[in-house]
Structures are given as C-alpha cells and as structure tokens.
C-alpha cells in the first residue's frame, strides 16, 4: 500500500530519487575517500535522474496535451487518459471528467432546444385559447362583481352581528333570509353555535353556583371538626392532669409504705418501742388505705373521661366520612365541568379559525383549566381527609389502650388496698400478742415488700397513662391542625377557582330561559353571576 501511494505522488518519487542519489554520493565518498570523484559522481547522478524524470514528464505532458487539443477542436468523443498514477494521471482524469460533463451538457442543450421549439408551438395554440378564455373571463367577472356586491352586503350584516357577539353578547343572531344558499348555511351555523354557546354558559353559571354553595357547606363542616377536635384536646388534657395527680398520690402511698417498712425494722430491732411503732404503722396503713381509695376513685373518673373521648373521636370519624362524600361530589362536578369544556372545544373547532371561534376556544380552555384545577383541589382535600382519618383511627386505638391501662390500674389499686388491710390485721395481731412479735414482724415485712412492689407497678402504669394521654393530646392537636388546613384549602378554592369561574362567565350576556320559551326577543339579557356570586 505504501509503494502504490508513493507511485501516485510525483513529488514523493522525485524526493526518493534525490535520496537515492544522495545515498550513492555517500557510498562513493566512503568507498573512494576522494572528493573530486564524489562530486563528479553526484553531478552525474543528478543529471541522469533529471534526464529520466524530465523525459518521462515531457512525454506525459505531450500525451495529455495532444488529447486535450483534439477535445478543444470539437471532438468530444476523444478520451483523455494517462498511464501514470501520480499527479499527472490525476490531471488526465480531471480533464476526462470535464470532457464527459461537457458532452452531457451539450446533449442536454440539444434536448432543451427541441423542447423549446415544441413549447413555442404549444404557446401559439395556448394564446388563441387564452384569447377566448379572456372573453369568457370578462363575462364571468361582471357576474362575479354583481355576486360579490350581494355577498359583501350580507357579510357586512353578518360581521356586525358577530362583532357584537364577540364582545360577550350571546343574544345576537343573524338574519338568514337570503337568496344565496352558502350565506344562509353560514348564518344558520352561526345561530346554532350561539344557541349552543349560550346554553353552555348558562350551564357553567349554574355549576359555579352549586360549587360555591357546596364549598360553603364544606367550610361549615370543617369548622365543626375543628370545634370537636378542640373538645377532644381539652378532654385528653384533663386525662393527663388526672394521671399526674394519680402519680402524686401513688408517690405518697409509696412513701407511706416505706414508713411502714421502717417501722417493721425498728420493731425487729427493739421490742421496747413496739407499741409506739405499731401505732405509727397503723397510722401509715390508714393513710395508705385512704390514698388507695382516692386513687381508685381517680381511676374510675379517668375511665369515664376516656370513654367520653372515645365517643367524641368516633363522632369526628363520622364527620370525616361526610367530608369524604362531599369531596366525591366536588370530583364529580370537576369531571362534569371538564366534559363541558370538551364540548365547548368541539363547538370552537366547529366554528372554524375565525376570530369568534378563537375567542370561544379561549373560553373553552379557561373552563377546562378551571375544571382541572377543581379536580386537583378535590384530590388535595381527599388526601388531607385520608390523613385525618388515619390520625383519628390512631387516636382511637391509643385511647382504647389507655382505657385498658386504666382498668388494669384500678385492679392494681384494689389489690394494694387489700394488701394494706392485711397490714392492718398484722398490726392488730402484734398488739394482741408480744410472744408472737417475731413472727408478726416477719409477716409484716413481707407484706410491706409486696405492697411496695404493687405501688411501684401502679406508679409505672400511671406514667404510661400520662405518656399515652400526652400522645393522644398531640394526635388530636395534629388532627385539629389538619382540619384547619382543610378549611384553609376550601377557602382558597372558593376565593380563587369558583370566583374565577364566575368572573369568566360574567363577561357574557345570555337570554333568559323564560324569554326563549315564550318566543320573545333574544335581546333580553339574563342576570350574570359576578365575582361575589351575585347578579351583575
């Protein structure tokens, strides 16, 4: 591949010849070590190389020049070729391509000349036909001017009516009593379009009013949920407060039990102080029994409060279900509004690409966008309601668990009360018999230890009750915040989407349904809904 590439390059071949000559000079100089001989050999080599190269180059140039001269003299069949593969061969190939292109252009010019002669004959025939057509066109022009004048008058009347309709007066209609079927068709289609548009605007007005009314009802329901959540927070706070009180009383009971234990140890250490210690233990036992009774009463009160809280949460869950139904209604209304926008888009497409159709299309797009925004708001409300429902169920479960813990705490307090009564009996036995003091002291110590364990267990349950009540309060507060978010979303929806829809519809004037039914004038406008939902 390298040899073939070098053969196609004249400069490369010449350079290789000079390199070979230089190599020869170096070889002669090294061999003979004679400068004059080296110079003579170099000159001889260069002359020989130049002669060979010049002879070959001159021959190639003469060959190409002769072929090119014959082509220049008009012999386009003469091919221009060369046996060389270097730049001279490329030159011959380029001249050959030019010859072939020139021959093709000449053939094309011959064909074009023949076509021109044929076209000239056809043009003469066409001129005669054009003269006849000119006369017919003049007659048709006169007829067209008369018809255009009639169409212009009718179109002017149509245009005035359509301009009035474009400003929002949907009561405008055109007079279709004309002798021209095309204009009559246009007028009939326009009147039908205005009837459909008027009905659509009237329907959209009704839907907007219904959406506003239902949104107001949802706002009222949301306010009820907030109030209910506030009551629940108050009830749970009360539960937490009572649990704290219970914890305080249990701590007091634990202190009393510790006193009883200390008394028992002193009885075992010294018999002399047995009487006074027995009185202290009896006093502490009475106090512990009173505290246990009080704690039992508090447990009963907490259980009642928890039952009330459960009822309120269940009522809140029912109200959330009602909100879900209302969201479903809003979703249906959004879908119906979207269907109205689709029908309006179809009517706009039927009206064509004129200014009225474009204006109607803009209104249809606005209604469609509003329907989509309504759907998005409904989806957001549904998501919030779903979150509130989940939180309500969590609160219900937590309160149910709290009630179970309270019932368990009540049983524990009753057990503690029974233990304290046992302590009192043990103290009576100590007072009746000094001989049995050691056995009684041992039993009392065991009973006191059991009582301390029970009191500690009840204290732990009280802490759990307090924590659960705090969690329930936080959950209900979160539920109330969710209800407030629902109310804010409803208010934003009412202040933006509904009012925007009513504002859009308020820009149109439509005929009353009573006037259309009675066959009265279509110029009677119906009351339009303003931005505040009233008449405009």
Curated annotation (Swiss-Prot):
Record keywords: Transmembrane included?
Answer: yes
Entry's InterPro entries?
A: Chemotax_Me-accpt_rcpt, HAMP_dom, MCPsignal_dom
Output the Gene Ontology terms for molecular function: photoreceptor activity; transmembrane signaling receptor activity
Start and end of every Methyl-accepting transducer domain? Answer: 221-459
Q: Which terms are listed as keywords in the entry?
A: Cell membrane, Chromophore, Membrane, Methylation, Photoreceptor protein, Receptor, Repeat, Sensory transduction, Transducer, Transmembrane, Transmembrane helix
Residue ranges, annotated region (Disordered): 116-145, 278-307, 512-536
Subcellular location per UniProt equals: Cell membrane
For this UniProt entry, which segments traverse the membrane? 15-29, 40-55
Q: Which residues lie on this side of the membrane: Cytoplasmic?
A: 2-14, 56-536
For bias type Basic and acidic residues, the affected ranges are 124-145, 287-296
The Gene Ontology biological process terms listed for this entry are: chemotaxis; signal transduction
Q: Which residues lie on this side of the membrane: Extracellular?
A: 30-39
* Entry GO CC: plasma membrane
Bilayer topology annotation: Multi-pass membrane protein
Q: Name one Pfam family in it.
A: HAMP
The answer on whether this UniProt entry bears the keyword Membrane reads: yes
Tell me its family.
Belongs to the methyl-accepting chemotaxis (MCP) protein family.
Q: Function, please?
A: Transduces signals from the phototaxis receptor sensory rhodopsin I (SR-I) to the flagellar motor. Responds to light changes through the variation of the level of methylation.
Name recorded for this polypeptide? Sensory rhodopsin I transducer
Q: Which organism is it from?
A: Halobacterium salinarum (strain ATCC 700922 / JCM 11081 / NRC-1) (Halobacterium halobium)
Tell me what gene encodes this. Answer: htr1
């Amino acid at each position: 591949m390298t040899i073939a590439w070098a053969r196609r390059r004249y400069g490369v071949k010449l350079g290789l010849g000079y390199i070979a000559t230089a190599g020869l000079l170096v070889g002669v100089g090294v061999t003979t070590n004679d400068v004059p001989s080296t110079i003579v050999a170099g000159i001889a080599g260069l002359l020989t190389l130049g002669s060979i190269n010049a002879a070959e180059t001159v021959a190639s140039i003469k060959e190409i020049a002769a072929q090119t001269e014959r082509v220049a003299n008009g012999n386009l069949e003469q091919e221009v070729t060369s046996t060389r593969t270097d730049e001279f061969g490329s030159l011959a190939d380029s001249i050959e391509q030019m010859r072939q292109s020139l021959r093709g252009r000449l053939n094309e010019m011959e064909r074009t000349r023949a076509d021109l002669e044929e076209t000239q004959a056809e043009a003469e025939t066409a001129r005669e036909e054009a003269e006849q057509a000119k006369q017919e066109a003049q007659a048709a022009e006169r007829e067209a001017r008369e018809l255009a004048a009639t169409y212009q008058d009718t179109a002017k009347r149509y245009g005035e009516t359509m301009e009035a309709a474009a400003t929002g007066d949907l009561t405008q209609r055109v007079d279709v009593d004309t002798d021209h079927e095309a204009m009559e068709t246009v007028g009939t289609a326009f009147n039908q379009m205005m009837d459909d548009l008027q009905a659509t605007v009237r329907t959209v007005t009704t839907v907007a009013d219904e959406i506003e009314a239902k949104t107001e009802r949802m706002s009222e329901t949301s306010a009820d949920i907030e109030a209910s959540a506030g009551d629940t927070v108050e009830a749970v706070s009360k539960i937490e407060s009572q649990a704290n009180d219970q914890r305080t009383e249990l701590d007091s009971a634990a202190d009393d039990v510790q006193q009883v234990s200390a008394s028992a140890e002193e009885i075992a250490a010294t018999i002399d102080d047995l009487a006074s210690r027995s009185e202290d233990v009896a006093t502490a036992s009475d106090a512990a029994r009173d505290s246990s009774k009080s704690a039992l009463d508090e447990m009963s009160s907490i259980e009642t409060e928890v039952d009330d809280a459960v009822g309120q949460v269940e009522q809140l869950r029912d109200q959330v279900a009602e909100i879900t139904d209302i969201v479903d209604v809003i979703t249906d209304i959004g879908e119906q509004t979207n269907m109205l926008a689709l029908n309006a888009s179809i009517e706009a497409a039927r009206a064509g690409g004129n200014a009225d159709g474009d204006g109607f299309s803009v209104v249809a797009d606005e209604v469609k966008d509003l329907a989509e925004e309504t759907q998005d708001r409904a989806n957001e409300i549904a998501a919030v309601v779903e979150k509130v429902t989940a939180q309500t169920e969590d609160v219900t479960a937590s309160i149910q668990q709290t009630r179970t813990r309270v019932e368990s705490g009540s049983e524990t307090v009753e057990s503690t009360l029974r233990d304290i009564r046992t302590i009192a009996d043990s103290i009576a036995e100590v007072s009746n018999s000094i001989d049995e003091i050691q056995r009684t002291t041992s039993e009392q110590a065991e009973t006191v230890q059991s009582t301390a364990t029970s009191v500690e267990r009840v204290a732990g349950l009280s802490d759990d009750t307090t924590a659960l009540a705090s969690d329930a309060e936080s959950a209900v507060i979160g539920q109330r915040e969710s209800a407030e978010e629902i109310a804010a979303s409803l208010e934003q929806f009412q202040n933006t989407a509904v009012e925007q829809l009513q504002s859009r519809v308020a820009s149109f004037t439509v005929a009353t349904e009573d006037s259309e039914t009675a066959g009265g004038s279509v110029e009677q406008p119906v009351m339009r809904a303003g931005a505040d939902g009233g008449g405009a």
